[in-house]
Amino acid sequence: LWYYDNREDLKKVVRLHGKSTERDFYVGEKHRDEIIAMDTNHEGFPDSVHGYSLKSDRIEFLKGNNPENANYIAKFSELNTELCHILSSRNNALAQLYPPDGHISWHNNANASAYNIIFSWSETGDGCFKYIDGHTGNEVVMQDVKGWQCKAGYFGAYGEPWYNRV
């Protein structure tokens, strides 16, 4: 919860990606269907994200020459290393802090297929994780609850894509 506890300070130094006004389109059925129709022409990454990227190789600061930037990167590295050790994980693909109207658009992760563990914390329980079950083709909604939740699963490569959005 360090990021959540320090969210007001983070907002002053970390760039907020994307626009909340785009959310309905990018998490909607029309965009989902467009991404699925692209098949292997979809590169795997989401087209739109509205949130703060916190991973050290993706974080963007509002001021590039702020001496505090190094402290944020060091803190992320410390927390990321600790989490990877606890989980016996080699990589962490994503670390995001979403504003109340945040999102990640429909995508398939086929460019980085792997087993995933997704930890999220919700203040209100209003968010959700949606995915298309790669075996049945059905859309599944995993509604957030207040507090912590954990989701685990396999995001497949091309030929077995697992379309999802937050």
Spans of features found by a protein language model:
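Short, intrinsically disordered, charge-balanced linker/junction segments flanking boundaries
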Residues: L1, Y163-V166
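Detector for Asparagine
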Residues: N6, N41, N65-N71, N80, ...
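Catalytic core of non-heme Fe(II) oxygenases with the double-stranded beta-helix
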Residues: S89-W162
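Non-heme Fe(II)/2-oxoglutarate
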Residues: L1-L87
